Amino acid sequence: MITSAAGIISLLDEDEPQLKEFALHKLNAVVNDFWAEISESVDKIEVLYEDEGFRSRQFAALVASKVFYHLGAFEESLNYALGAGDLFNVNDNSEYVETIIAKCIDHYTKQCVENADLPEGEKKPIDQRLEGIVNKMFQRCLDDHKYKQAIGIALETRRLDVFEKTILESNDVPGMLAYSLKLCMSLMQNKQFRNKVLRVLVKIYMNLEKPDFINVCQCLIFLDDPQAVSDILEKLVKEDNLLMAYQICFDLYESASQQFLSSVIQNLRTVGTPIASVPGSTNTGTVPGSEKDSDSMETEEKTGSAFVGKTPEASPEPKDQTLKMIKILSGEMAIELHLQFLIRNNNTDLMILKNTKDAVRNSVCHTATVIANSFMHCGTTSDQFLRDNLEWLARATNWAKFTATASLGVIHKGHEKEALQLMATYLPKDTSPGSAYQEGGGLYALGLIHANHGGDIIDYLLNQLKNASNDIVRHGGSLGLGLAAMGTARQDVYDLLKTNLYQDDAVTGEAAGLALGLVMLGSKNAQAIEDMVGYAQETQHEKILRGLAVGIALVMYGRMEEADALIESLCRDKDPILRRSGMYTVAMAYCGSGNNKAIRRLLHVAVSDVNDDVRRAAVESLGFILFRTPEQCPSVVSLLSESYNPHVRYGAAMALGICCAGTGNKEAINLLEPMTNDPVNYVRQGALIASALIMIQQTEITCPKVNQFRQLYSKVINDKHDDVMAKFGAILAQGILDAGGHNVTISLQSRTGHTHMPSVVGVLVFTQFWFWFPLSHFLSLAYTPTCVIGLNKDLKMPKVQYKSNCKPSTFAYPAPLEVPKEKEKEKVSTAVLSITAKAKKKEKEKEKKEEEKMEVDEAEKKEEKEKKKEPEPNFQLLDNPARVMPAQLKVLTMPETCRYQPFKPLSIGGIIILKDTSEDIEELVEPVAAHGPKIEEEEQEPEPPEPFEYIDD
């Protein structure tokens, strides 16, 4: 056994090359044991490598590499490993090889990324030996069928050739495509490179045996290429693949921005114009409202054209199909369907609100209860609680009245057809001026009803804002207009809001500053940024600054590194409100990206800024950046949640709420639990609200602590000595937990994995309730109905059932509160014992008379008890439209005997087009009527009695 390498090392000093070669071979065999001894003579080995006349110089490089590896000098080790050429075996499983390959890939990645950012002429050449090792590594991954690993390395090293090759060579091409698309959406931080990857994915998807148009369109949304989407839709209509076109339209509406959708609609309209002039088309002037009529017209045209001998292509069908697609893309269909779902399945427990109403004693909690009521009834159109408590509601004065009126907009969210009629009482009138707070609230409510789907209401709000003579009405009008025209970047709207901003009125300016951001959402409009930042630096009004702080951030929504220059300048500003704007801008620009640079910046500010508001905003903003990986958030903010600074603790609570919204994340709840007992009341408020955001729609089975928190909210609300701030948080938390009649969740990304713009905006503005309670209503933008809605070829809901393969209690509605009348009953029963005794006597007499009957009854009762003891079934059938929670989608299937087949997997949820495999007549789901005030003429008269014959005796 060798105890020293000194003898072998001495051979390196020999003149004979063969002896040196022999020494190197021996050293290579013992280097792992004697590297410390060999390291003293490593310079001799280096000299051998540098001697170009030496035959085994590559072997010298390998030994030197191993020595440097053991010394921890990985860079030198890598250089010599490259010099070893083929002697460095990438397929070897030793720790040395694994480490050097990792360093090699890191080094190669760094060079590739640096080159990618440089113009063509300035790119640095990459060492061919380095590339050779990486290529060998790729081949090893492919040979071992480690395709995901290869895709990951290919994307890191910007090797699109390898990326494409890996997908095509894999044994599961659709699976690899889905994996790559997910990586693109969640992890890729450079926009330019992401777009190149998406182009490759589009190419592969289109070249599949059966092109996957649904995923192609998801890629095209990211690429912001509405023209290509329009071309696909046009192609599908021509190929008579209408159902696929409809499905894509619904997916587009859910994932794309308003500007993108309007471009697609515009393209479809221009495509549709020649088709519209087909002779005999009777459908040109009609709005696609009454589908039955238009369908019957189509069949008539078909038969007519067939008789004359024309081809079916000449029929006027496409015009009607285009109209239907436009109706879907405009969001009209989805909003109507979601409204139907929420009205039909409304399961609000009014007892919760009644108990809260009876417990509150001041105006802040009164306002909170009104807001909580609107959350609970969001989109259900049910204003029953307000109608039952008009006297209590009338206590709201001034801005509380503004908030209460605006809450109707949340209740009637999406109820667009009758919006003006519903709100008529509260809107400004030419004749007699009403309460300014009520009128302002009414205009704000109209914006909430039409949020991100303005249409014609934008012009109405534009005129109302022009004619408003009062700053309160202008405040509501600006917010309403911003919501309705969200993301449209309309110049006339922008100019009017800018005029209102420049009036230098604090109340108007706050709303106008925020509304400017809403209208220019994600546009990165240089003029808008210049105007807003310029005015923010001039104005003396803190309120205007606050509005602009959020508005500026919204303009940079989703722009990632393009916002860096603005973020830098805002973060350096002397004004703390503008520094806070910088934090929000980071949150909006990088929302959902998980970008490490952005996280580092926010964490640095969270512990270093001198202003509490800025620190709080920085921590809150972490939630927006991490929401795609909610499991990471608790570890990032856990230390901040124990900070000595209460503002940082509050920010940590809200960050958890935002990031883990709707997930029921146990770690997040464990962090929030101690914060609900914080000595500082506003920290408790944040913890209570955040806990509701996380546990929305969770049941005791999916999240065991949900009932414990329900009781906590109730305890805080009913405790007379508790602080108003904590009570405000608890009341809002109750509203959030049971939002939308228990039928909505909060999610910052769409079902297809895109960042859901209205949700992100809604949650960001909601956090501003810290300064201004009426902004709480913005949370309604983030509520997403948890539904599966199946539609047939006519875009109607057929009667169909879905099978949920888990116990009904797993995702059941929470049990309603029991009416507390039991105690009174007990008192009464003890007071009338004599009567019960008499009743028992009578029962005994009956028993004697009807023994047989009683036996039967008892037997029946026993059967009932046995039935109750029966085990819970393992599945449940849900009727269309069905309430299906995100976690439940995994276990959702179509029953085997079902005549309908979904066009995309049920596990994605949302609105799904169903293909009918049967020729039988379909049964359709009857639409339900919305609640709310009705015009008197519309009320149905009682039906006349049935005809009868009067016989005079």
From Swiss-Prot:
PTM sites of type N-acetylmethionine: 1
InterPro entries: 26S_Psome_Rpn2, ARM-like, ARM-type_fold, Proteasome/cyclosome_rpt, PSMD1_RPN2_N, RPN2_C
A Pfam family this chain is assigned to: RPN2_C
Keywords noted in UniProt: Acetylation, Phosphoprotein, Proteasome, Repeat
GO biological process: proteasome-mediated ubiquitin-dependent protein catabolic process; regulation of protein catabolic process
Gene3D superfamilies (alphabetical): Leucine-rich Repeat Variant
Basic and acidic residues composition-biased segments: 290-303, 842-852, 859-872
PC repeat segments: 403-436, 441-474, 476-510, 511-545, 547-580, 581-616, 617-649, 651-685, 686-726, 729-761
Chain residue ranges for the region called Disordered: 279-318, 839-881, 930-953
GO molecular function: enzyme regulator activity; ubiquitin protein ligase binding
Residue numbers of Phosphoserine PTMs: 290, 315, 834
GO cellular component, one term: proteasome storage granule
Top-level lineage group: Eukaryota
N6-acetyllysine carried by residues: 310, 720
Modified residues (Phosphothreonine): 273, 311, 830
Biased composition (Acidic residues): 936-953
Keyword Secreted: no
Function: Component of the 26S proteasome, a multiprotein complex involved in the ATP-dependent degradation of ubiquitinated proteins. This complex plays a key role in the maintenance of protein homeostasis by removing misfolded or damaged proteins, which could impair cellular functions, and by removing proteins whose functions are no longer required. Therefore, the proteasome participates in numerous cellular processes, including cell cycle progression, apoptosis, or DNA damage repair.
Summary of subunit composition and partner proteins: Component of the 19S proteasome regulatory particle complex. The 26S proteasome consists of a 20S core particle (CP) and two 19S regulatory subunits (RP). The regulatory particle is made of a lid composed of 9 subunits, a base containing 6 ATPases and few additional components including PSMD1. Interacts with ADRM1. Interacts with ZFAND1.
Family as reported in the entry's similarity comment: Belongs to the proteasome subunit S1 family.
The name this protein goes by in its record: 26S proteasome non-ATPase regulatory subunit 1
Originating species: Pongo abelii (Sumatran orangutan)
Name of the gene: PSMD1
